[in-house]
Amino acid sequence: MIPALYLSHGAPPLVDDDLWVSQLTAWAGELPRPTAILVVSAHWESAPLTIGSTSPRTPLTYDFWGFPQHYYDVTYDAPGAADVAARVEAAMPADEPVRHDPHRRLDHGAYVPLTVMYPDADVPVVQISMPTLDPQHLLRLGERLRPLRDDGVMLIGSGFTTHGLPFLDDPSPGAVPPTWSTEFDAWAAERFAAADVDALIDFRHRAPGMPYAHPTI
């Protein structure tokens, strides 16, 4: 079974970070090559669950503002994983409708890390939305998608462990992370290692650093 990955993507300039690039490049070299990739990005919240375009001719979604032009000139024309999209729809229960958006392709939470891991854009990719922020519901969604991994489909969750942008006193590169961020990160890593699903689902009440770590949830 191919692993599921959780990647931090940050803003588009993260592709200029040598450490981040080296880590993702190493992962791509060490892991089995996927038959296809299914991405869930924190940048696309849409209910009901929505499946993005499977056509490589659909432009990327440049969902960021105020950056130099060359970040908007990036292309990533990976094949669309139409068969994976069909399996996602088939895996959903009858009382949870699925929508298709033929005009939305990959956003920067999806294509930025993929340009590093699979720069030749030769692995089929499809993106789906986050249909809810409810952890229990998302856990059930993950359980429905899990069988895709048996067929070599890599599931990627893309986002940050914390996202307390309003509370960052110093957002510059190399700044010392705030305590609420480091404490939340350490707690999450510990709970994942212990497979403590109950605690992770109830992170709003149990995790240190809340609500600063995730003020929008």
Model regions and ranges:
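Surface-exposed, charge/polar-rich loops and edge strands
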Residues: P124, L133, R140, R144-M154, ...
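Internal, conserved structured core segments that host functional sites
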Residues: V84-L138
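Secondary-structure boundary elements
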Residues: G29-P34, A91-P97, L133-H137, P147-I156, ...
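Short acidic (Asp/Glu) patches
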Residues: W20-T25, H70-D73, R104-V112, L138-L141
